[in-house]
């Protein structure tokens, strides 16, 4: 019989109690990355984690690597451009070969939404989805939740808060994972984008950024995923920015909550997604999200490998 283990493929894999546990542990690490217990370091010392990223990444792959090392584990990053995948080896065969080497966990990112679910069917070690197509990016949603949890003080305080997602919602796995998670926690959600960037949904939608800003306590800006577009939607990114950039002027004129906070999963297109002045504003939580990425991924790895 195959050994049973926990995977993190989507946020619904976690119960509310488990999410609270991760928030508690990640909060400790966010306050002090060195707050790893000696017992945890000893248990993680011989753990080997493999990162299989079939799509480019800066923040996610780096924070998983740093998280692994801070816990005391070792991480192997496979360069897909120089691996046998570039010679025509299938995703499944690449995964099975790495899996046969018996790592303690595998972190994967792939352009196909179904990829991690397919691989999890025969994985006998914890599998973490670090981004799959347009469907899911669970650790990003968890680190974003940690950022909101820190700002508002508790999950109870988050209930009823209003968040607007602005940008390419349809093609954003970050938005998809966040929406599913935040709905569970009682937040009110609005999507703001041109028609071609909006999914079919029962959620509130608008094409008007001013309306979204007026609605929100939290603004989540999303980049335009041009690599997933079949045809240009705007003549240029500048034209898109003219319609959907979060600017100081727009915040001043339309934000009903003057303490509205701004998030972005990165990479940020400066002065297209968010105006540079807004990124430097104290209401911007973008770099806090990056820091929290390490803390939350430390908590996730510890949870899956040790608990």
Swiss-Prot record:
One of its GO terms (cellular component) is cytosol. The keyword Transferase applies. Keywords: Pyrimidine biosynthesis, Transferase. InterPro entries: Asp/Orn_carbamoyltranf_P-bd, Asp/Orn_carbamoylTrfase, Asp/Orn_carbamoylTrfase_sf, Asp_carbamoyltransf, Asp_carbamoyltransf_Asp/Orn-bd. It is an enzyme of class 2 (transferase). One of its GO terms (molecular function) is amino acid binding. It holds the Pfam family OTCace. Pathway: Pyrimidine metabolism; UMP biosynthesis via de novo pathway; (S)-dihydroorotate from bicarbonate: step 2/3. It catalyses: carbamoyl phosphate + L-aspartate = N-carbamoyl-L-aspartate + phosphate + H(+). L-aspartate binds at residues 87, 173, 223. One of its GO terms (biological process) is 'de novo' pyrimidine nucleobase biosynthetic process. Carbamoyl phosphate binds at residues 59-60, 109, 137, 140, 266-267. Its EC number is 2.1.3.2. Catalyzes the condensation of carbamoyl phosphate and aspartate to form carbamoyl aspartate and inorganic phosphate, the committed step in the de novo pyrimidine nucleotide biosynthesis pathway. PANTHER family: ASPARTATE CARBAMOYLTRANSFERASE (PTHR45753:SF6), ORNITHINE CARBAMOYLTRANSFERASE, MITOCHONDRIAL (PTHR45753). Belongs to the aspartate/ornithine carbamoyltransferase superfamily. ATCase family. Heterododecamer (2C3:3R2) of six catalytic PyrB chains organized as two trimers (C3), and six regulatory PyrI chains organized as three dimers (R2). HAMAP family: Asp_carb_tr. This is Aspartate carbamoyltransferase catalytic subunit. It comes from Helicobacter pylori (strain HPAG1).
């Amino acid at each position: 019989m195959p050994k049973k283990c926990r995977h993190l493929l989507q946020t619904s894999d976690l119960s509310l109690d488990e999410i609270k546990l991760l928030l508690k542990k990640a909060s400790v690490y966010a306050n002090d990355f060195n707050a790893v217990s000696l017992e945890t370091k000893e248990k993680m010392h011989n753990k080997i984690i493999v990162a299989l990223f079939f799509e480019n990444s800066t923040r996610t792959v780096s924070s998983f690597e740093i998280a692994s090392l801070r816990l005391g584990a070792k991480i192997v990053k496979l360069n897909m451009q120089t691996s046998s995948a570039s010679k025509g080896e299938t995703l499944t065969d690449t995964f099975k070969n790495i899996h046969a080497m018996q790592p303690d966990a595998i972190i994967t990112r792939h352009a196909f939404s179904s990829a991690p679910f397919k691989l999890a069917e025969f994985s006998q070690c914890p599998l973490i989805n670090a981004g799959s197509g347009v469907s899911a990016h669970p650790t990003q949603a968890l680190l974003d939740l940690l950022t909101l949890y820190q700002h508002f003080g508790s999950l109870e305080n988050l209930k009823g808060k209003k968040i607007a997602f602005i940008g390419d919602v349809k093609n954003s796995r970050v938005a998809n994972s966040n929406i599913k998670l935040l709905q569970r926690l009682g937040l009110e959600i609005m999507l703001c984008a041109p028609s071609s960037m909006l999914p079919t949904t029962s959620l509130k939608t608008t094409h008007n950024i001013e309306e979204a800003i007026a609605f929100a306590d939290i603004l989540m800006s999303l980049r335009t995923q041009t690599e997933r577009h079949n045809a240009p939607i705007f003549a240029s990114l500048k034209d898109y920015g003219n319609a959907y950039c979060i600017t100081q002027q727009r915040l001043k004129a339309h934000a009903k909550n003057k303490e509205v906070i701004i998030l972005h999963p990165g990479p940020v297109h400066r002065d297209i997604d968010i105006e540079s002045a807004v990124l430097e504003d104290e209401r911007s939580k973008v770099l806090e999200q990056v820091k929290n990425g390490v803390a939350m991924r430390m908590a996730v790895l510890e949870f899956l490998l040790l608990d």
